[in-house]
Amino acid sequence: MILLDYVFLKRCLLLFVKVVCILLDLSALRERLRDYLSRTIPGNLELYNVYCLLQYRVDCLSLLLTKPSRLYHIVLRHQGGDINSADLAFSIAFLSPLSIILGNPGLVRELLDLVKSGRDDEFLEVVVKNLKHGETRGGEA
């Protein structure tokens, strides 16, 4: 019985450590993304933060890394409901920089498809997977 409890506790601890590491990685990614966007598209974060804070009480980068489909809908409304414009704006403003930082610029289309279909959990899985690979590839920014 004690051995079983030890094995269970060890697995729980390893899972906890893994989750904490992912959260720390996402926090660092968020900061790198904020710095990159502030340098390359000045004022864009501030604009979208107004919308995000008013509607969801959270900044746009936190929304991007938790509920990206909500951020996409904010961009869609800002673009007057024009899907093509929203796709382009969302890709340029958020997905391309994210993909560059992750070291995989080819991710934009996949991430956009996941966001548009509301598959936020899968979006996050792709980001986390590429975050780990990006460390070995040496993502930019």
At which residue positions do the language-model features occur?
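Acidic-enriched, low-complexity/disordered segments with a strong bias for Aspartate over Glutamate
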Residues: 5, 25, 35, 59, ...
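Short terminal alpha-helical segments
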Residues: 6-60
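Short amphipathic alpha-helical segments that mediate assembly, nucleic-acid/protein binding
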Residues: 9-10, 26-34, 46-47, 68-71, ...
